[in-house]
From Swiss-Prot:
Species: Rattus norvegicus
Main location, first listed in the record: membrane
Entry keyword Ribosomal protein: no
Keywords carried by this UniProt record: Cell membrane, Glycoprotein, Ion transport, Membrane, Sodium, Sodium transport, Symport, Transmembrane, Transmembrane helix, Transport
InterPro entries recorded: MFS, MFS_dom, MFS_Na/Anion_cotransporter, MFS_trans_sf, Pi_cotranspt
Known glycosylation sites: 39, 47, 56
Topological relation to the membrane, as annotated: Multi-pass membrane protein
Record-given protein name: Sodium-dependent phosphate transport protein 1
Length: 465
C-alpha cells in the first residue's frame, strides 16, 4: 500500500469541510426551531382558564382571537401534540441510518428539510380543524426531521478527518441547541406582536429557503467537489485512508448485540435524550408555573439555557480536539470525560434547582446550567460510534438515536402525566427519575466504553487508497 503523507498546509476554518459544518449547523437550527416553537406557542394557543361556552368578550378580545386563535385542549391532548413529533422520528431512524451507509444523503436531507418546512406552514390551519390533524402534521414532521438529524451523520464518514471530528461534529450538533434558543427567544415576541400562527409561518419559510441553498451548495463526496482545493481534498482523503469503506455490506448484528462498548453508547444516548427532551419540552412550563411570567418573558428566560449550551458545545469541540491532537488524553479518556460532564452535571443542577433555588435569580441560574451542560455530550458518547465502528456509523447512529428517541417520547409523555396527577411534587419526581437514569447509564459507560475500532467492525475491510 502506498504511504501517503498529510499535506503540510491545509485550509482551516475557511474551507469547504467547515462550510459543510456551518450549513448543517443552520439546518439543525431550523429543524429544532420548527420542533421546539410549539412548546412556547402552546401557552398562547390553549385557553387554560376560560371554559369554551363563555362568550362575554369585548371587541378587542375578539380581534385578538383572530390573530391568536385559542383552542380548548386538555393537558393530556397537549402532551400528545408535543410528543407526537417523536413518533415520526422513531419510524425513520433505522431506514435512514441503513441507507446512509450505502447511498448519498444530500438529496434525502434537502428533501426532508423542505418537507418539514412545508408541514410547519400547515400547522396553524390544521389547528383550526382540530388537535388530531396537528398530531398528524407533527408525526410527519418528525419523520422529515429524523431523516435530517440521522442522515447527516453518514456525511461525516467521508468529510471529517479523525483529529477534527470533535470540532466539526460539535459545530454541527450545536445547531440543535441554537435552534431552541432562537425559537424560544423570538417566539414570545412574535406571539405577542403578530400572533402565534406567524411563528410557524416564519420558521417554515426560512426552512424552505435554506433547503434551496442546500441543494445548490452541497456535494456528497469531497473528491467530487468542483471548487475544493487539491490540498484540502488530499488532506481529507489521506486522513481517512485507513478508514473502512462503508459500502453495501452485511451487518454483524450478532456481534453488535454482544458489544458492551456499543451498549454503553446506546444507554447514554437514551439518558441524554431523556434529559434533553424533558428539559427542552417543559422548561417553558416550569418557568410559567414557578416564576409566573408572561409569554414574552417566558420566551426570554426559556432561551437563556440554549445560548450557554451553544457556547458549551463549541468549547467542548475545541477542547476535545486539543486534548487529542496534543496527545494529552487517549480517545476513550476524552469520550469518558465529556460524557461525564454532559450526563452528570445536569443531575447536580436539577437537584440544586429543587433545593437551593430560593429566589428568581437562583432558579434561572440552575435551570440554565442544567440545560447547557448537556452539550458536553457532543464530544462524548454522541460521536463515540464513529470511533469504534466508522464503517457502520450511519446505521449505529440511527439505532442509538432510535432508542434515545424512545426515551424522549417516554419522558415527555410521563412528565405530562405526572404534572397532571401530582402537581405539588411533579418536578421532584421528574427530576429525580432523570437523575437515576443518568447516573446508572453513566456508570455503565465509564466501565465499558472504548475508543478504538472494534473487531466486529474490522471484518472483511477494504482500505480506501
Amino acid at each position: 500500500m502506498e504511504n501517503r503523507c498529510l499535506p503540510k498546509k491545509v485550509p482551516g476554518f475557511c474551507s469547504f469541510r467547515y462550510g459543510l459544518a456551518i450549513l448543517l449547523h443552520f439546518c439543525n437550527i431550523v429543524i429544532m426551531a420548527q420542533r421546539v416553537c410549539l412548546n412556547l406557542t402552546m401557552v398562547a394557543m390553549v385557553n387554560k382558564t376560560e371554559p369554551p361556552h363563555l362568550s362575554n368578550k369585548s371587541v378587542a378580545e375578539m380581534l385578538d382571537n383572530v390573530k391568536n386563535p385559542v383552542h380548548s385542549w386538555s393537558l393530556d391532548i397537549q402532551g400528545l401534540v408535543l410528543s407526537s413529533v417523536f413518533l415520526g422520528m422513531v419510524v425513520i431512524q433505522v431506514p435512514v441510518g441503513y441507507l446512509s451507509g450505502a447511498y448519498p444523503m444530500e438529496k434525502i436531507i434537502g428533501s426532508s428539510l423542505f418537507l418539514s418546512s412545508v408541514l410547519s406552514l400547515l400547522i396553524p390551519p390544521a389547528a383550526q380543524v382540530g388537535a388530531a390533524l396537528v398530531i398528524v402534521c407533527r408525526v410527519l414532521q418528525g419523520i422529515a426531521q429524523g431523516a435530517v438529524s440521522t442522515g447527516q451523520h453518514g456525511i461525516w464518514v467521508k468529510w471529517a478527518p479523525p483529529l477534527e471530528r470533535g470540532r466539526l461534529t460539535s459545530m454541527t450538533l450545536s445547531g440543535f441547541v441554537m435552534g431552541p434558543f432562537i425559537a424560544l427567544l423570538v417566539s414570545g415576541f412574535i406571539c405577542d406582536l403578530l400572533g402565534w400562527p406567524m411563528v410557524f409561518y416564519i420558521f417554515g419559510i426560512v426552512g424552505c429557503v435554506l433547503s434551496l441553498f442546500w441543494f445548490i451548495l452541497l456535494f456528497d463526496d469531497p473528491n467530487n467537489h468542483p471548487y475544493m482545493s487539491s490540498s484540502e481534498k488530499d488532506y481529507i482523503t489521506s486522513s481517512l485512508m485507513q478508514q473502512v469503506h462503508s459500502g453495501r455490506q452485511s451487518l454483524p448484528i450478532k456481534a453488535m448485540l454482544k458489544s458492551l462498548p456499543l451498549w454503553a453508547i446506546i444507554l447514554n444516548s437514551f439518558a441524554f435524550i431523556w434529559s434533553n427532551n424533558l428539559l427542552v419540552t417543559y422548561t417553558p412550563t416550569f418557568i410559567s408555573t414557578t416564576l409566573h411570567v408572561n409569554v414574552r418573558e417566558n420566551g426570554l428566560l426559556s432561551s437563556l439555557p440554549y445560548l450557554l449550551a451553544y457556547i458549551c458545545g463549541i468549547v467542548a469541540g475545541q477542547m476535545s480536539d486539543f486534548l487529542l491532537s496534543r496527545k494529552i488524553f487517549s480517545v476513550v479518556a476524552v469520550r469518558k470525560l465529556f460524557t461525564t460532564l454532559g450526563i452528570f452535571c445536569p443531575v447536580i443542577f436539577v437537584v440544586c434547582l429543587l433545593y437551593l433555588s430560593y429566589n428568581f435569580y437562583s432558579t434561572v441560574i440552575f435551570l440554565t446550567l442544567a440545560n447547557s451542560t448537556l452539550s458536553f455530550s457532543f464530544c462524548g458518547q454522541l460521536i463515540n460510534a464513529l470511533d469504534i465502528a466508522p464503517r457502520y456509523y450511519g446505521f449505529l447512529k440511527a439505532v442509538t438515536a432510535l432508542i434515545g428517541i424512545f426515551g424522549g417520547l417516554i419522558s415527555s409523555t410521563l412528565a405530562g402525566l405526572i404534572l397532571n396527577q401530582d402537581p405539588e411534587y411533579a418536578w421532584h419526581k421528574n427530576f429525580f427519575l432523570m437523575a437515576g437514569i443518568n447516573v446508572t447509564c453513566l456508570a455503565f459507560y465509564l466501565l465499558f466504553a472504548k475508543g478504538d475500532i472494534q473487531d466486529w467492525a474490522k471484518e472483511t475491510k477494504t482500505t480506501r487508497l
